[in-house]
Regions:
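Internal alpha-helical transmembrane segments
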Residues: 10, 14, 21, 32-34, ...
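Primarily interfacial, aromatic-capped hydrophobic alpha-helices that serve as membrane anchors
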Residues: 62-68, 460-480
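PDZ/PDZ-like peptide-tail recognition elements
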Residues: 142-174, 207-259, 316-318, 327-348
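Functional transmembrane alpha-helices
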Residues: 2, 124-135, 244-268, 273-279, ...
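PDZ/PDZ-like domain segments forming the peptide/carboxylate-binding groove
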Residues: 159-203, 243-279, 283-286
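Hydrophobic membrane-targeting alpha-helices
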Residues: 154-162, 420, 424, 468-475
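Juxtamembrane extramembrane loops of integral membrane proteins
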Residues: 112-116, 132, 175-236, 262
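Small-residue-rich helix-interface/hinge motifs
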Residues: 3-122, 422-444
C-alpha cells in the first residue's frame, strides 16, 4: 500500500505541474495579445469544482449562478431583424479554479471554437481569439506545447547540473553480456563484450544500446580477446528485445555474494559475503542472471503444482568458499528469494556539469529523447505494440517505489516531452489540430468555416476519448491477468 501511495503521489505531482504549465503557455500568449481568458482550471470541473476565485462547488453542483458575477442587459438582433434583450455576464476577469477530475486542465479563451462555440454567431469583439491576426492565434495555440518542451529541456539541464550523468561504459564491462535463447541463436555468446555496430559505437548500457542492436545488420563483439563480427539474420525489433523474458541481453554479474539479508534462507543456511554459488538443484550457475532464470523456472513449477509448493521451494545449493566446495539445502521464501545481494563488479562513471555547461547538454539530451520517442512510435502500429499501450496505471507504475527526486524529475521531463508531442499531433480537439487549421489559413488566405471547425472538433474529441479508453482498458486487462 505504501508503494502504491508513493507512486500515486509522484504521478499526480508530475501531471499537475505539467498541466498547469501547459495551460499557462496558452494563458501567457492570450494575455500578451489582449485576448480574454474566462476560466483557467487545473483539472476538469464537470458540474462542480473544488475551489474557484468567484464561485463555489455547491452552487455549481445545483446549477446556481455565482453571486458575485454581475449581469447586464444586452440587445441582440436575429437573422430576421427581430431584437430581444438578454442578461449577459459582465467580464470581471479570469476565474481561476481547481477541478476534481484529474484528466487534464483547460484555459477557456474567449472566441475559440471549442471553448465558447455558443458565442460564434454573436457580434465579434476586439478581445476575442477569432478576431486576432493568424500569427497571434498560432502563438496562442502552440504556447502550451512550447512551454512543455522548454520545461523538459530545463529539467534535464538541472538534473545534469545537480546529479551529473552516471553510467557504466559498455566496453568496460569485463564480464561481458549474457543473452537469452534468441540472442544465442543469432550468434551471440555469454561473455561477449559489445563494441560497435554498423550504425555506431556502444557507449552506455541504456535504451540506446537496444536501439543500436535493433537497427544493426552487423554487430562487433570482443570474444575471448578477439574482435568477432556477428551478422544478424533475425529481424528483431526493439519491442521484441524489451518485452522478452528473460531479457534479450543484460550485464553479466558473477553469482558472488556481497551481503546476506537478515532472517532469510541465505542467513539460516550459513552463506557469507564472498561465497560463489556454483549450482542450484544440480544446474550450473555461472552468473546471477542465470540464477534468477532458474528461480523463475521453480516459480513455473509451483504454478503448475501449487499443492507441492513447499516441496518445490526446497532447493539444494552448491557454493564455493576459499577454494572449498560445499552443499546446503534450504527453503526459498514465498517470493522465491534466497536472501542475498550480489557483488556488482563495475565502477560507474559520473560526468559532472557546471550550470552553464548543463544548459546545452540538457537541451541536447532533450532533443535526443524526443527523437527516440518519435522513432519508437512506429511500434504502436503493430499488434504487439498496440497491446503495449498503457493509460494512467502504466504511467504511474513508471515512477520509483521509493521517493527519489532524481528519478522523479527524469520521469517528469519525459512526460513533459510526451505531452508536448501528443498535443502537437494534427488531431482536431488537440492543439495540433488548431495549428493545422491556422497553417491552412495562412497558406490559402481562407479560414475554414465555423461549422466545419465544430464538426472537426467533435470528431477529434471522439478519437482522443477512444484512444484513452483503449489505453486504460489495456491497463485493466493487464491488472486482471488477461495480457
Amino acid at each position: 500500500m505504501e508503494i502504491f501511495l508513493i507512486k500515486t503521489l509522484q504521478f499526480f505531482m508530475a501531471i499537475s505541474l505539467l498541466v498547469l504549465l501547459h495551460e499557462l503557455g496558452h494563458f501567457f500568449f492570450a494575455k500578451l495579445f489582449g485576448v480574454r481568458v474566462n476560466r483557467f482550471y487545473l483539472f476538469f470541473n464537470y458540474r462542480f469544482h473544488i475551489a474557484s476565485t468567484y464561485d463555489t462547488w455547491v452552487r455549481r453542483l445545483f446549477h446556481l449562478k455565482p453571486e458575485v458575477v454581475p449581469t447586464r442587459e444586452v440587445t441582440e438582433t436575429d437573422d430576421n431583424g427581430k431584437t430581444k434583450t438578454v442578461q449577459e455576464k459582465e467580464y470581471v476577469g479570469t476565474e481561476y479554479g481547481l477541478g476534481w477530475l484529474p484528466l487534464g486542465g483547460y484555459c477557456a479563451i474567449d472566441g475559440m471554437i471549442d471553448e465558447t462555440n455558443q458565442k460564434l454567431s454573436e457580434e465579434t469583439h476586439p478581445w476575442e481569439f477569432r478576431v486576432k491576426p493568424t500569427w497571434q492565434r498560432l502563438l496562442i495555440m502552440v504556447g502550451g506545447v512550447l512551454v512543455n518542451f522548454l520545461l523538459a529541456l530545463f529539467i534535464y539541464a538541472m538534473v545534469l547540473y545537480t546529479w551529473g550523468e552516471t553510467y557504466v561504459p559498455v566496453q568496460q564491462m569485463s564480464y561481458g553480456m549474457e543473452f537469452n535463447e534468441q540472442g544465442r541463436q543469432m550468434g551471440f555468446r555469454d561473455g561477449d563484450i559489445l563494441l560497435r555496430t554498423n550504425e555506431g559505437e556502444f557507449k552506455k548500457f541504456d535504451a540506446d544500446l537496444f536501439r543500436l542492436l535493433a537497427d544493426a545488420n552487423e554487430v562487433q563483439v570482443l570474444r575471448d580477446g578477439t574482435a568477432t563480427t556477428i551478422t544478424k539474420s533475425d529481424d528483431t525489433s526493439l519491442l521484441d528485445m524489451i518485452k522478452s523474458d528473460p531479457p534479450f541481453l543484460r550485464p553479466r554479474i558473477p553469482a558472488v555474494i556481497d551481503s546476506v539479508l537478515p532472517a532469510t534462507p541465505a542467513e539460516e543456511a550459513g552463506l557469507r559475503k564472498g561465497d560463489r554459488l556454483a549450482s542450484i538443484n544440480g544446474v550450473e550457475i555461472v552468473s546471477f542472471g542465470r540464477l534468477t532464470e532458474q528461480l523463475a523456472k521453480i516459480g513455473d513449477r509451483i504454478s503448475e503444482m501449487p499443492a507441492d509448493s513447499m516441496k518445490i521451494r526446497r532447493v539444494t545449493i552448491t557454493y564455493e568458499r576459499d577454494g572449498i566446495t560445499d552443499t546446503i539445502t534450504t527453503t526459498l521464501t514465498a517470493d522465491l528469494k534466497i536472501g542475498f545481494s550480489p557483488v556488482y563488479p563495475y565502477t560507474p562513471t559520473t560526468e559532472e556539469y557546471g550550470f552553464i555547461e548543463s544548459l546545452p547538454a540538457g537541451a541536447g539530451y532533450g532533443w535526443h529523447v524526443l527523437a527516440s520517442y518519435v522513432d519508437d512510435l512506429k511500434y504502436v502500429f503493430s499488434a504487439d505494440g498496440a497491446k503495449s499501450l498503457g493509460g494512467f496505471g502504466t504511467i504511474g507504475s513508471l515512477f520509483p517505489d521509493t521517493w527519489d527526486w532524481h528519478r522523479f524529475w527524469l520521469m517528469t521531463a519525459l512526460l513533459s516531452i510526451i505531452l508536448a508531442f501528443m498535443n502537437i499531433l494534427p488531431i482536431p480537439a488537440l492543439d495540433g489540430g488548431h495549428v493545422l487549421f491556422l497553417l491552412y489559413e495562412m497558406v490559402t488566405g481562407r479560414k475554414p468555416s465555423d461549422q466545419f471547425m465544430v464538426r472537426a472538433e467533435y470528431i477529434g474529441f471522439g478519437f482522443v476519448v477512444i484512444l484513452m479508453v483503449l489505453a486504460n482498458l489495456n491497463d485493466i486487462l493487464r491488472w486482471l491477468g488477461y495480457m
